[in-house]
Amino acid sequence: MFFGDTLDIIFLSFVAVGTFIALINVFLSIRKPRVFGSHGRRTKRWLRISAILFFIYMAISLSSTVLSNMIWGDGSYRDPANELQVLGTTIGSLSFSAIVHAQLKLTFDLYDKDTSDNRNKSFGLFMSPQILNLIYFVVTHIRLYAENLPSRGFQTVSNVSSITFMLVPFFIWVASVISLVFTLIYAARTQVPVPRGAFGCLLASSILSVIRHTWLAILNILYFVASRTNGRLYLVFPDYFSNISIVITVWFAALCVLLLIVGSSKGLRGREPWRDEYSYGPAVSGYPPLEPAPIHMTSYGRAY
């Protein structure tokens, strides 16, 4: 049986709304992939990945929220709600990195900067927090299930879990800031024509992402500092704080994915390599049409 006051019900409703938006994002990214055109295949792939991962994260968060308010939860660290929270935190960090990675991919595709060097940079920004994320998942489950650890070993595992839990959002915040910087630099310096709607959606998604990850990074640092003071420092937030936090952490992320999908449909559609039936030579993207073929030549370059 579920119990809770009005604020708990509002919190659960906010999580449910975020889950619904995440489901819409999955539908839009999978149901009609042709709306993006054939350009930017990596962007479309990462949009689908980020949308699916974020929906899984929201489904786990919704289940964990309901489960933590069930009467039969024993409140111990190993109860089902806490196990779901650890899994949700891990998948959530993976989905947030994927969203930032999709932002970078869309930026590179819109401004024709999808070079090998940029791909390596974006992949490095994606993998750096995920290495820490994997460490967090492993050591937290060691703490969760290894009951026979000596006290010193248990303390070491707890410290590693706390440190990685703090560092993962910080690394993702760094990646989100770099993504925003790339967007602003390419928009100011390149001459590639980009539809205003696509640039506006990309910029809005990047700004929301920076705000969201700044919020999370600050909160995690505060929690880490409080946990290191041996109880001398307590963080006391108003009752409605969790509802504000869920809007920033969940709704902003869902809107980021939705804005990226809309921006991709506006910016990537119609950017396929140009080819005309009266032209010959390779198809070229971003350049004027080739001269018409001579009248004695067919469109395949063969004489009559």
Language-model segments: residues:
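Membrane-proximal first intracellular loop
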Residues: 1-117, 190-198, 235-240
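Extracellular loop 3-seventh transmembrane helix
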Residues: 5-19, 77-96, 155-176, 196-277
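Residue-level signal for alpha-helical transmembrane segments in multi-pass membrane proteins
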Residues: 21-28, 64-67, 102, 136-139, ...
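Cytosolic juxtamembrane helix at the C-terminal end of the final transmembrane segment
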Residues: 30-33, 103-117, 145-150, 181-194, ...
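Helix-to-loop junction signature of class
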Residues: 57-75, 135-151, 209-230
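The cytoplasmic-loop to transmembrane-helix boundary for the fourth helix
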Residues: 109-140
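Extended, charged alpha-helical interaction scaffolds
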Residues: 131-189
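Intrinsically disordered, low-complexity terminal tails of fungal membrane proteins
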Residues: 262-304
